[in-house]
């Protein structure tokens, strides 16, 4: 016997982890399966909250499970799914075609993400500091995303946590594939695409009546948490040019901060025309004040 393998076989096993893995395998195909996955992840690193979502390219994500921390519950249930998900780094990574794997927020977030309004609203304001996502790609247009989170009361995830999660990832991904094969028919019955079509229309048409196409590209990078330097790199131009575009955006939209821009973008989503080319900002601004207050 290879002495290296002998040593590995003699390593002590964590009985709690083994029990959690056994429960996860036994629960494949059941409604409680995602709970058992979170229990497994909670055995290898500290987890304050977490959940699972089904990502779609052509419709809004579907929440399967979310174990909230108390502060997260202070947000309306649909606060994320009503549109802001389009700015989520993991959702954007999914749209870009990333492979199945483990993704740490600090590795994939844009360089100014932690100063963005999105991070303030959906992380720090509700007490979160960090997250790790385990994404399994079903096909080009769909993926299952399992996520775990840390609160601001505790230290962010560390490299040792990621090593442990990545060690277990092949087992979890294999179990995910089996679970999906048994439950796919039920998942496909969810077909509400209206919100996602409105979100996509807002991304494509927001402020088109006031801004140039390049300014609108810069705007989306702004609210996604990209710095001027990284935006310039993505758009293959200079940082100085991007800064000029940013000034023009603030002037044309009569806003003074990223918080105002983020808020305006979100408020315009209900006024977007699905699959259309109408500027939702123009519709929003022309709507009666009472109608705007309801969004």
Regions found by a protein language model. Name each.
Residues 4-12, 16-32, 36-142, 147-153, ...:
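Regulatory input/activation interfaces that engage signals or partners
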Residues 166, 220, 233, 251, ...:
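A cross-family signal for key residues in well-ordered alpha-helices
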Residues 176-193:
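Short alpha-helical interdomain "coupling" segment at the junction between an upstream regulatory sensor module
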Residues 201-208, 250-295:
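Basic, Lys/Arg-enriched C-terminal extension of HTH/homeodomain DNA-binding domains
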Residues 214-218:
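The N-cap/first-turn positions of alpha helices
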Residues 222-226, 265:
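Short helix-to-turn junction characteristic of helix-turn-helix DNA-binding domains
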Residues 225-260:
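Recognition helix of helix-turn-helix DNA-binding domains
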């Amino acid at each position: 016997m290879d002495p290296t393998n002998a040593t590995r076989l003699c390593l002590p096993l964590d009985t709690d982890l083994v029990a959690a893995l056994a429960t996860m395998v036994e629960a494949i195909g059941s409604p409680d399966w995602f709970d058992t996955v979170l229990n497994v992840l909670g055995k290898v690193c500290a987890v304050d909250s977490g959940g699972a979502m089904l990502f779609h390219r052509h419709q809004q994500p579907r929440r399967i499970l979310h174990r909230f921390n108390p502060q997260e519950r202070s947000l309306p249930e649909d606060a994320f799914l009503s549109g802001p998900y389009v700015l989520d780094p993991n959702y954007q990574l999914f749209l870009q075609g990333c492979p199945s794997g483990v993704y740490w927020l600090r590795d994939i977030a844009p360089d100014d993400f932690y100063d963005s309004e999105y991070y303030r609203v959906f992380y720090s304001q509700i007490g979160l500091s960090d997250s790790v996502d385990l994404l399994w790609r079903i096909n080009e247009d769909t993926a299952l995303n399992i996520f775990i989170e840390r609160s601001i009361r505790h230290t962010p995830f560390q490299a040792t946590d990621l090593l442990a999660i990545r060690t277990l990832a092949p087992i979890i991904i294999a179990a995910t594939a089996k679970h999906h094969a048994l439950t796919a028919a039920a998942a496909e019955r969810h077909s509400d695409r209206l919100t996602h079509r409105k979100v996509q229309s807002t991304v494509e048409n927001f402020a088109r009546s006031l801004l140039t196409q390049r300014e609108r590209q810069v705007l989306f990078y702004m609210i996604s948490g990209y710095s001027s330097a990284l935006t310039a790199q993505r758009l293959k131009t200079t940082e100085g040019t991007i800064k000029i575009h940013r000034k023009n955006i603030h002037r044309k939209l009569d806003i003074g901060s990223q918080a105002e821009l983020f808020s305006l973008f979100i408020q315009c989503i209900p006024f977007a025309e699905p699959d259309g080319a109408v500027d939702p900002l123009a519709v929003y601004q022309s709507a009666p004040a009472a109608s705007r207050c309801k969004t």
